[in-house]
């Protein structure tokens, strides 16, 4: 049976009717239905969960005459199972028992208390601590796209308005959302297909008026002018849908989402999806994190610092004032790194703890960690106080002190609290008098009974008097049958035994009532006091979030100071003049994985030297040289020091890379098609301030086609766009370009050949390479000797046929010789013999018809 199609629940048992009504409200997601100590799943949900979680599929009786497929998971292990489902892009509705089974007639009342989705999780167990977890929404109209992202674990809310498909693809690549909401009529499905966590949403959720209303309500504002997003209608449509979805799933207020920020293209260096992939910023080409720029650069000591550093790497800033401030801070912090990092490490992930506090899902250990973070602040303040730097002092001020909150948590929460508040033992002794009394009652029953027994023996003089307890009759005073006639008048008989009588007195009855309820009362009061702690902490949420942000930024900057010192990086200089000048530049990742010294290389790009044609053997280091230039520029524009002896860098608006390619089988695109699509994007969008890396353009097609395309692309970049370009090629004909165009120069990476062996020099020299060393590289790769021998023989034959092949002059007139000669069109021949001045109007008209027939 499929519950989504069965709307008549009357044939089912009352409990299954309740389940099916709840399930009908959440037809597309799994429903965890609480029954005692288990969460149960039924019907299709059970079948799906058994496959996804590898749990047993069983049957539960019958309802409506059919056996019910069922699967269950224990409630104490729910977080582990949720983590597995979320990682597979699934969403889960958590349905809890909210009624009292003792007073319920029929099934106990239940309701869905939260919905766990990949993009809205805040639980520590479900999140990757050093990676942002974003929920995103995308909207499209005739003018472009609207895109909004929210990190619910920090409250960071952003929107943008990508103008075209390429920019939108780059945004998706940069943000990599865990969950993506899109309208039911979204046209560009090819753009988002294959992404995880896709959620189709109704059109009305994207309405602009609803969006404005929702956002103003959330921020407590009358309009959105103060956020700079008032006129970003496409972005607001996406943001409105996103906020509605979060409210639907969280079912609680969201006080930590206090503002929204517009991300504008002109504020950061733009990198398309291919560039981010090729530069291996946070993910390598195989999809892992090893040997990436982040892997080398990220030695941050807090998870929130690590996440901020990765955001910086993916959004390099163009504002040189911000960059110079970061550089100054890094320089100022270099002497205090070893003192600061151990203290910062103790701060932990304050950012995400605050999000759970705002959502009121923070656990006792979260509050203990928050207290521990507050306890580090005095020492951090003391260490930073002596640093002579205005930006550092500004950060110190934003960190705050929170002495009152620290004192509150030190008084309220025990040193090592349990995982859940329902387990009790969270609130510290001495914090609340009534709680201490209830606990004393629950814990101190034995002491009280001993004291009562001694007192009553002395008062009555009865040496056989004992005080005891049993599960049926509760507390009692027992006197032997021989002395029972001496029992005081206030003793009320409770039970008669063979050799004794048992009594109760009002004081003991009152104590019994207290003890039996004390544990429950203590737990209930403890839960109430715990909730009150939230009420005391939440008014400080804005200041706490500012502090967490400042601590994360401090962690990033201290980390960059440590990396600069450890890896021998230098501070780059920003200039208004276009160009990049690097002395002894190094590749930040390759130099770390090499077992031998890295050969540093210079680079000089300027308006007079805009393009470098790079030649040299395969494996000679062309790609490394190009990528290191882009990575040095990228590091400079996040404010970091860079791997070089000296760097002077001018304005950069975009970084493009056309480096390597593979078949895009999913989209049915060949290597060459992928290559040309990326090239077209560069030629359409590059400017004179762009840094362009072009590696082996045209190699995916025939020699002459490839050479023609490479020549034309180089010409366009050098003459028309005038971008700062590194153009690596295996077409030696392109080394003629500097003779034909201004601003183009040849450089090469050399190698030495000795017999069948080859030594790569990895150093960049001016001028063109003398040969390609292709056969030597093939031999090095292990190609059989007889194949290499035959290749040498064939090479000599080809060179004897065309001895000047390598030096063939290729200019505009000779380019046409590369294509097969074409027959002249009959229409062209007819036109060549025509004198237009001698034609009458009638003859001209006849000629038009004649030419039409010839075409």
Curated annotation (Swiss-Prot):
<dbReference type="InterPro" id="IPR007695">
    <property type="entry name" value="DNA_mismatch_repair_MutS-lik_N"/>
</dbReference>
<dbReference type="InterPro" id="IPR016151">
    <property type="entry name" value="DNA_mismatch_repair_MutS_N"/>
</dbReference>
<dbReference type="InterPro" id="IPR036187">
    <property type="entry name" value="DNA_mismatch_repair_MutS_sf"/>
</dbReference>
<dbReference type="GO" id="GO:0006298">
    <property type="term" value="P:mismatch repair"/>
</dbReference>
<dbReference type="Pfam" id="PF00488">
    <property type="entry name" value="MutS_V"/>
</dbReference>
<dbReference type="GO" id="GO:0140664">
    <property type="term" value="F:ATP-dependent DNA damage sensor activity"/>
</dbReference>
<comment type="function">
    <text>This protein is involved in the repair of mismatches in DNA. It is possible that it carries out the mismatch recognition step. This protein has a weak ATPase activity.</text>
</comment>
<dbReference type="InterPro" id="IPR000432">
    <property type="entry name" value="DNA_mismatch_repair_MutS_C"/>
</dbReference>
<dbReference type="InterPro" id="IPR005748">
    <property type="entry name" value="DNA_mismatch_repair_MutS"/>
</dbReference>
<comment type="similarity">
    <text>Belongs to the DNA mismatch repair MutS family.</text>
</comment>
<dbReference type="InterPro" id="IPR007860">
    <property type="entry name" value="DNA_mmatch_repair_MutS_con_dom"/>
</dbReference>
<dbReference type="Pfam" id="PF01624">
    <property type="entry name" value="MutS_I"/>
</dbReference>
<dbReference type="GO" id="GO:0003684">
    <property type="term" value="F:damaged DNA binding"/>
</dbReference>
<dbReference type="GO" id="GO:0030983">
    <property type="term" value="F:mismatched DNA binding"/>
</dbReference>
<dbReference type="InterPro" id="IPR045076">
    <property type="entry name" value="MutS"/>
</dbReference>
<dbReference type="InterPro" id="IPR036678">
    <property type="entry name" value="MutS_con_dom_sf"/>
</dbReference>
<keyword id="KW-0547">Nucleotide-binding</keyword>
<dbReference type="Pfam" id="PF05190">
    <property type="entry name" value="MutS_IV"/>
</dbReference>
<dbReference type="GO" id="GO:0005829">
    <property type="term" value="C:cytosol"/>
</dbReference>
<protein>
    <recommendedName>
        <fullName>DNA mismatch repair protein MutS</fullName>
    </recommendedName>
</protein>
<feature type="binding site">
    <location>
        <begin position="616"/>
        <end position="623"/>
    </location>
    <ligand>
        <name>ATP</name>
    </ligand>
</feature>
<dbReference type="InterPro" id="IPR017261">
    <property type="entry name" value="DNA_mismatch_repair_MutS/MSH"/>
</dbReference>
<dbReference type="InterPro" id="IPR007861">
    <property type="entry name" value="DNA_mismatch_repair_MutS_clamp"/>
</dbReference>
<keyword id="KW-0227">DNA damage</keyword>
<keyword id="KW-0067">ATP-binding</keyword>
<dbReference type="InterPro" id="IPR007696">
    <property type="entry name" value="DNA_mismatch_repair_MutS_core"/>
</dbReference>
<dbReference type="Pfam" id="PF05188">
    <property type="entry name" value="MutS_II"/>
</dbReference>
<dbReference type="Pfam" id="PF05192">
    <property type="entry name" value="MutS_III"/>
</dbReference>
<dbReference type="GO" id="GO:0005524">
    <property type="term" value="F:ATP binding"/>
</dbReference>
<keyword id="KW-0238">DNA-binding</keyword>
<dbReference type="InterPro" id="IPR027417">
    <property type="entry name" value="P-loop_NTPase"/>
</dbReference>
<keyword id="KW-0234">DNA repair</keyword>
């Amino acid at each position: 049976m499929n519950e989504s199609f069965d709307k008549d629940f009357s044939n089912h048992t009352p409990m299954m009717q309740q389940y099916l009504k709840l399930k009908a409200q959440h037809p597309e997601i799994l429903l965890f239905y609480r029954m005692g100590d288990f969460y149960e799943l039924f019907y299709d949900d059970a079948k799906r969960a058994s496959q996804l979680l590898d749990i047993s599929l069983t049957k539960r009786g019958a309802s409506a005459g059919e056996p019910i497929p069922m699967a269950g998971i224990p409630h104490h292990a729910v977080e582990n199972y949720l983590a597995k489902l979320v990682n597979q892009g699934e969403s889960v509705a958590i349905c809890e028992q909210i009624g009292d089974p003792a007073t319920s007639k029929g099934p106990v009342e239940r309701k869905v208390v939260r919905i766990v989705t990949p993009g809205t999780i805040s639980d520590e167990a479900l999140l990757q601590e050093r990676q942002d977890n974003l929920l995103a929404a995308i909207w499209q109209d005739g003018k472009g796209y609207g895109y909004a992202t929210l990190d619910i674990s920090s409250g960071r809310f952003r929107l943008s308005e990508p103008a075209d498909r390429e920019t939108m693809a780059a945004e998706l690549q940069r943000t990599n959302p865990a969950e993506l909401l899109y309208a039911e009529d979204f046209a560009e499905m090819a753009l988002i297909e294959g992404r995880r966590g896709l959620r189709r949403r109704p059109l009305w959720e994207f309405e602009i008026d609803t969006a404005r209303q929702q956002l103003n309500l959330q921020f407590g504002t009358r309009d959105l002018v103060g956020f700079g997003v008032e006129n970003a209608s496409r972005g607001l449509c996406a943001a409105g849908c996103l906020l509605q979805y979060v409210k639907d799933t969280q079912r609680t207020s969201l006080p930590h989402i206090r503002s929204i920020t517009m991300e504008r293209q002109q504020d950061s260096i733009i990198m398309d999806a291919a560039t981010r992939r090729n530069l291996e910023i946070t993910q390598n080409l195989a999809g892992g994190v090893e040997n990436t720029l982040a892997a080398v650069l990220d030695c941050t000591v807090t998870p929130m610092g690590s996440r901020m550093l990765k955001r910086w790497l993916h959004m390099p800033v163009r504002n040189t004032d911000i960059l110079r401030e970061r550089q100054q801070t890094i320089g100022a912090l270099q002497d205090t790194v070893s003192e600061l990092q151990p203290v910062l490490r103790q701060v932990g992930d304050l950012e995400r703890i605050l999000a759970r506090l705002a959502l009121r899902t923070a656990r006792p250990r979260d509050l203990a960690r928050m207290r521990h973070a507050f306890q580090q602040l005095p020492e951090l303040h003391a260490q930073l106080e002596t640093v002579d730097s205005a930006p550092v002092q500004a950060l110190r001020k934003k960190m705050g002190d929170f002495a009152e909150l620290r004192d509150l948590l030190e008084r309220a929460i025990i040193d090592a609290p349990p995982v859940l508040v329902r387990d009790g033992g969270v609130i510290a002794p001495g914090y609340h008098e009534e709680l201490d009394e209830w606990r004393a009652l629950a814990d101190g029953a034995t002491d009280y009974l001993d004291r009562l027994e001694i007192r009553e023996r002395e008062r009555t003089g009865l040496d056989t008097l004992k005080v005891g307890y049993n599960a049926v009759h509760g507390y009692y005073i027992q006197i032997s049958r021989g002395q029972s006639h001496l029992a005081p008048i206030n003793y009320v008989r409770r039970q008669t035994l063979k050799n004794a009588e048992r009594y109760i007195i009002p004081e003991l009855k009152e104590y019994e009532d207290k003890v039996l309820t004390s544990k429950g009362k203590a737990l209930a009061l403890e839960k109430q006091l715990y909730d009150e702690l939230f009420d005391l902490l939440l008014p400080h949420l804005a200041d706490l979030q500012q502090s967490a942000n400042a601590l994360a930024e401090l962690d990033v900057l201290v980390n960059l100071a440590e990396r600069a010192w450890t890896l021998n990086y230098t501070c780059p200089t920003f200039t208004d003049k276009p160009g990049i000048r690097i002395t002894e530049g190094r590749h930040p990742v390759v130099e770390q994985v090499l077992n031998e010294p890295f050969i540093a290389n210079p680079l000089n790009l300027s308006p007079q030297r805009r393009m470098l044609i790079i030649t040299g053997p395969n494996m000679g280091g062309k790609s490394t040289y190009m990528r290191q230039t882009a990575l040095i520029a990228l590091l400079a524009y996040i404010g970091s020091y860079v791997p070089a002896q000296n760097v002077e860098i001018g304005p950069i608006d975009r970084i493009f890379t056309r480096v390597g390619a593979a078949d895009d089988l999913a989209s049915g695109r060949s290597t060459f098609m992928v290559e040309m699509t990326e090239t077209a994007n560069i030629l359409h969008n590059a400017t004179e301030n762009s840094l362009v890396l072009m590696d082996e353009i045209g190699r995916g097609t025939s020699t002459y086609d490839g050479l023609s395309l490479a020549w034309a692309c180089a010409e366009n970049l050098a003459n028309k766009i005038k971008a700062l370009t590194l153009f690596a090629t295996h077409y030696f004909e392109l080394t003629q370009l500097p003779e034909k165009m201004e601003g183009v120069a040849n450089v090469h990476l050399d190698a030495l050949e000795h017999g069948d062996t080859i030594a790569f020099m990895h150093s960049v020299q001016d001028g063109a390479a003398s040969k390609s060393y292709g056969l030597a590289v093939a031999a090095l790769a292990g190609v059989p000797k007889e194949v290499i021998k035959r290749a040498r023989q064939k090479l000599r034959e080809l060179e004897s046929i065309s001895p000047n092949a390598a030096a063939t002059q290729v200019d505009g007139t000779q380019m046409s010789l590369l294509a097969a000669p074409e027959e002249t069109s009959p229409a062209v021949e007819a036109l060549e013999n025509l004198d237009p001045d001698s034609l009458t109007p009638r003859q001209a008209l006849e000629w038009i018809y004649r030419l039409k027939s010839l075409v």
